[in-house]
A protein has these predicted regions:
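Non-globular, low-confidence helical/coil segments that flank catalytic cores
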Residues: 2-291
Length: 291
């Protein structure tokens, strides 16, 4: 004699089963997107957006970890080197977003005065004297050279680095920029180089808004309208944004279109051309502008 399979829901009606299923789904979703567990990192992490004129350089410091992303232009190399050297004598990871002079021109001085353990860069190439000379410096230094691959992660003390881009090959060096999400506990920043709309849209497709979300967003390409598209800015949804550019630069950076996007979204933004060096401090749970 066959036996009927036991109903795991007992004598619940179909409606009761449906209610239980809805409750289970709600609990599952809450577990997936609910509050993050309290951070276990110790100490603080500093995010220094260095005033290098018309260029980019960012120093990230925590106990046991130092990361520098880009080194600004050559005409600010001495001041950039002094700023970084006054805070550390070793760089765990130097990330060079792409081979444009306003991002790598000051790197030679860093190799001359600091110990650099690892260098991350894309396979983008240009035959400019600035870039070829830098490649020689990297080789002479003995630093470990890492090709940037989307999805790769690296650890420097309590700092976690995730490479988001480049995802594909590009003819445009700006779109070849290494985009890095920097995480400290439950806080994060995104450093973008000069990445433009094409790469931004690829990152949305690859990672989705949940993984792109961050607290601090370095506005790409010094605030150019060829970068920072609406969909990417919505995905990143930062609390703070930083624009690194020089007063009276010939490019008109930051472009008005970019400023309007920030203001429409009520994103608090800061500019190195107005404030000089900009520093944020994170305790792993909250990010604040340093006094």
């Amino acid at each position: 004699m066959s036996r009927r399979r036991r109903n795991p829901f007992g004598k619940l009606s179909a409606g009761g089963v449906a209610v239980l299923l809805i409750v289970f789904v709600i609990l599952y979703v809450f577990d997936m997107v609910g509050p993050e567990p309290k951070s276990t990192v110790e100490g603080e992490c500093e995010f220094h957006f260095i005033d290098v004129g018309q260029g980019d350089s960012t120093l990230i410091l925590s106990e046991g970890g130092v990361v520098v992303i880009d080194a600004g232009p050559q005409d600010h190399a001495d001041s950039t080197e002094r700023y970084i050297k006054s805070r550390t004598d070793t760089i765990d990871y130097l990330i060079l977003t792409h081979p444009h002079e306003d991002h790598i021109g000051g790197a030679d001085e860093l190799f001359d005065s600091l110990k650099i353990n690892n260098v991350i860069l894309s396979d983008a190439y240009t035959d400019t004297l600035t870039f070829t000379r830098l490649l020689d410096k990297i080789e002479e230094s003995g630093a470990n050279v890492i090709e940037a691959k989307s999805g790769s992660t690296y650890i420097a003390g309590e700092i976690k680095l995730t490479i988001l881009s480049p995802i594909s090959e590009f003819s445009n060096l700006n779109d070849y920029s290494v985009v890095t999400k920097v995480e400290f506990g439950n806080t994060s920043a995104m450093i973008t180089g000069d990445v433009e709309h094409h790469s931004e849209k690829l990152m949305i497709e690859e990672f989705g808004a949940y993984k792109l979300r961050c607290d601090i967003y370095q506005i790409s390409h010094h605030g150019s309208s060829t970068s920072n598209c609406d969909s990417f800015m919505d995905a990143v949804s930062p609390e703070f944004a930083v624009i690194q550019s020089e007063t009276g630069n010939s490019y008109g950076h930051p472009h008005r279109e970019t400023i309007e996007k920030l203001e429409e979204r009520n994103i608090t933004y800061y500019r190195t051309d107005k404030m000089g060096h900009i520093v944020f401090v994170s305790d792993g749970e909250e990010v604040k502008l340093s006094d």
